[in-house]
């Protein structure tokens, strides 16, 4: 609320839900609201990943048969487009097949947010294929 006031942002059309101070209980409340159709998107904020993911992957949470992945969207003051990074948090060592699933999840999420015509970069530590660096081999296979 302080940030909204400082930035002179109107919260008139925003419902603020008071949640418990316990991050896991707050996440459970958010997951329940998604299941009820009251929320369309979960935002992580400053929660620890395990506090967020526990209620999501619980059998009564939001788990589906699809791979769960993470999408981080951000703006740079000196760049004209929104940028996204996936999956830097949930899937620790994905193979090329799993990376394709993660990419598909991200593209679907962006489309739901109204972001179409997405450009994708498969990033590794170097821009050339290195047979000793699996991420470069995967990038070549995905592209």
Can you describe what each PLM-predicted range is?
Residues 1-143:
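Anion-binding alpha/beta catalytic cores of soluble intermediary-metabolism enzymes, centered on
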